[in-house]
Every structure is written in structure tokens, then in C-alpha cells.
Amino acid sequence: MAKVKIGINGFGRIGRLVARVALVRDDVELVAVNDPFITVDYMAYMFKYDTVHGQYKHHELKVKDEKTLLFGDKPVAVFGLRNPEEIPWAETGAEYVVESTGVFTEKEKAAAHLKGGAKKVIISAPSKDAPMFVVGVNEKTYTPDIDVVSNASCTTNCLAPLAKVIHDRFGIVEGLMTTVHSITATQKTVDGPSSKDWRGGRAASFNIIPSSTGAAKAVGKVLPDLNGKLTGMAFRVPTVDVSVVDLTVTLAKEASYDEIKAAIKEESEGKLKGILGYTEEDVVSSDFVGDSRSSIFDAKAGIALSKKFVKIVAWYDNEWGYSSRVVDLIRHMAAAK
């Protein structure tokens, strides 16, 4: 199958990391980037140097001119347009556009990219109305007539594969999720105004901040069997990357914690290899920086109260793992018949 040509709108955390993932893979080709708020030389700087993931070393990166970045010998077109419908994706051959501004998360707004020649749009965030797909869980329900999709959230990508295994094997009656989540760009370095979420405006590096998340409820969209059975919340904590899901569930069938571990291990080595991981090591969050899997079950961190009530813990690099799934979803869509 030919390389799938990708464009990226919005060169923030996820946009830049999707670009990093795409540039080291041989099944996709990055051809264009659009961001109205940064110049091409600043784009190159932000791409090359990354506090969390380190300096980019796979290609020599140069600015050819105001509209072109060179990754080694590979040119990537650069645009600086605010309106999605004005971006000339067709000129660059970009068929799949990653919408990672965080602004155009609704189906109709994201669909504006189609006017510029994009064939499909992948929103790198949850969406109110675009169909959501989580690779390893429900991507097989995608059909080629769908032009705008959402890759859900990083937390839903961690939780859904885990919930699927538990539900398929033992049945989930109901459950609560907490994600202990690293800082993201929407937070404040010092206390500042945040009228919609007062707590969210407090200093990110000095506080544990309770926050809402739709990640658990969204699992019900990708796994309809679990609709209405899961909900959850988040604590934002002062780490810059890697988060951890704590899923506490009531099971339909009795199971020992060892049986649950065995089921997850089996799936992590089988159908969900590369998506779901399994570890019995004494790991901490920084051990997962740069881990491309969606969800890594921590066998030593979980605990069971009884054969029907259990807490399951899974790590995820909320930046790199998620960005890897964006590219996987594009490949799946391109291959779908």
C-alpha cells in the first residue's frame, strides 16, 4: 500500500508529536503543516527542541524558505492560514488532515478542511458530534463513507482497551475512573483567570487540581455495552508528561486478581499487542515517557477487595502514545474498504 499523505493543522503539543511519529514511520508521509500563529523558523525550533521528548535527531531540520521546512531532503509545505477552508491541502497532496488546534472539534467546523482538498479529517480531541474511534477497540466499525472522525482523548485511549478486556472476560456492572493526569497547555503557570473552571486557573506546578473529564463516559460511545456504566474525574498533577488511570469496577463474574492479570497479559501479547501493555516491574511515571502504547497495565499497583470488586491501574504517555494512535487510525482508515 502506498504511503498515506498527511497534513497537520495546529502545531502545538499533539501536532508536533504527530509530525515526529509520522516522520519516522514508513507507511505515512508528512507533506504539509498549517499554523497561523508561528513563523516557519519558530516552527523548526519548537519541533527540534522538546523538553519532554528530547531533541529531534532523525533528520537534519532546515528552513528552506518562508513556506518550506526540510527534514533531511524531504520538503514539507508550511501555511499560516486561520480558516480551515482556505488551506490548500490539495496542492500538497495531503489526503488525511490531523485537526490538532483544539478549536475545530465539532464535525461541521472540522469538515471545512474538505473544501481545501482534504479527503478525511482526524480530530485529535474528543468531539461532541464526530464519530469517535479508539484503535484496538472499535476502529473496525469505521466505514469509508465517514469523512470526519475523532481519535477521542488520550485518557479514553488508555481506559477503553483495558475496559474492553475486563468487560469481555468478566463483565463490568459499573465502575469509576480517576486519572492522575500530567499538566497540559491549557493550565496556568501561576494563578490566573479561568472563568469556566476556577480550580483550573490555579498554578499547575504547585497544586493537585481536581478536574472534570469526559473520558470514562466516552468509553460508552466506543463500547456501547458500557454506556452509562462508567464515569470518572481527573486530578491534574505537577508532572509534564505521563498519566495514570485508576479504574475501580464491580464485576459481573467472580475473578481472582491473578485471573484478571492473566487475562490482560494474554490480550497484551495477542490482539492488543502494541496497544495494551503489561508490566510487573516497579515502575514510576517517567519510565513511560516515549512509550507508544495506549495503556500499560501495572500488575503490582492494582488491588482486589473481593472477587467482584477490583481496582486496576494503567499508565499512558498522554502525548506520545496518543499521537501514535492518531497515525495508526489514519492507516486503518486508508486501508478500509
From Swiss-Prot:
The gene is GAPC. Its main location: cytoplasm. The keyword Signal does not apply. One of its GO terms (molecular function) is glyceraldehyde-3-phosphate dehydrogenase (NAD+) (phosphorylating) activity. Signal peptide: none annotated. CDD domains: GAPDH_I_C, GAPDH_I_N. It catalyses: D-glyceraldehyde 3-phosphate + phosphate + NAD(+) = (2R)-3-phospho-glyceroyl phosphate + NADH + H(+). Gene3D superfamilies: Dihydrodipicolinate Reductase, domain 2, NAD(P)-binding Rossmann-like Domain. The active site is at residue 154. It is found in: Cytoplasm. Its EC number is 1.2.1.12. Homotetramer. Pathway: Carbohydrate degradation; glycolysis; pyruvate from D-glyceraldehyde 3-phosphate: step 1/5. SUPFAM superfamilies: Glyceraldehyde-3-phosphate dehydrogenase-like, C-terminal domain, NAD(P)-binding Rossmann-fold domains. This is Glyceraldehyde-3-phosphate dehydrogenase, cytosolic. Pfam families: Gp_dh_C, Gp_dh_N. The keyword Cytoplasm applies. It comes from Craterostigma plantagineum (Blue gem). InterPro entries: GlycerAld/Erythrose_P_DH, GlycerAld_3-P_DH_AS, GlycerAld_3-P_DH_cat, GlycerAld_3-P_DH_NAD(P)-bd, Glyceraldehyde-3-P_DH_1, NAD(P)-bd_dom_sf. NAD(+) binds at residues 13-14, 35, 82, 318.
